[in-house]
């Protein structure tokens, strides 16, 4: 924050991945700066982990778990002379289960900060947590008031559309990005960037 101030900035968003652990330090340092006569605004938020639908993910997870059990059963039968390779239990299926994208959420108001705290807290619940605290469209829809949403970085939601569709065509990339952007616009309105 000091460095930003020294370079002429009067505000800065600092976000942690999946939590708001640094927020208290940001708040305390902003108070210190104010006491020193430095007019500086901390912007509170989180760089969240996002999956489009936790319910859909849960179905995929349950299917992968079942496929793994089937593969084990089939593997045990291998010694009896028959074996079927089950592709559902391969590494790519595991990667898709742990896949998540980044999404930056910033508080535009006290209500927005309260909603960000609620989103973070819920993302750690058993229903949403899988290796990382995750949020989906349904959860964001419930707690979007006062929240600004940014599409984030190269691991962000729009970048994901590029990485997933780049080998199909430029048009496929644009269609996927437009669909995602429309969903976020529906939730956040003009607070999605």
Q: Where would I find each of the regions flagged by the language model?
A:
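Phosphodiester-processing cores and adjacent nucleic acid-binding clamps
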Residues: 1-193
């Amino acid at each position: 924050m000091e460095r930003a101030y020294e370079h002429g900035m009067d505000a800065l968003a600092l976000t942690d991945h999946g939590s708001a652990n640094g927020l208290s330090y940001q708040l305390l340092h902003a108070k210190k700066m104010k006491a020193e006569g430095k007019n500086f605004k901390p912007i509170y938020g989180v760089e969240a982990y996002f999956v489009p639908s936790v319910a859909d993910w849960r179905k995929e997870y349950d299917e992968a778990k079942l496929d793994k059990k089937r593969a084990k059963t089939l593997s045990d039968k291998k010694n009896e002379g028959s074996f079927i390779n089950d592709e559902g239990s391969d590494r790519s299926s595991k990667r898709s289960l742990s896949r998540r994208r980044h999404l930056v959420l910033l508080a535009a108001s006290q209500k927005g900060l309260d909603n960000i705290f609620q989103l973070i807290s819920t993302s750690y619940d058993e229903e949403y947590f899988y290796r990382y605290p995750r949020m989906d469209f349904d959860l964001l829809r419930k707690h979007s008031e006062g929240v600004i949403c940014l599409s984030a970085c190269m691991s962000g939601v729009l970048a994901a559309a590029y990485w997933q569709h780049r080998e199909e065509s430029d048009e496929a990339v644009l269609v996927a990005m437009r669909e995602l952007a429309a969903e976020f616009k529906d939730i956040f309105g003009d607070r999605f960037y």
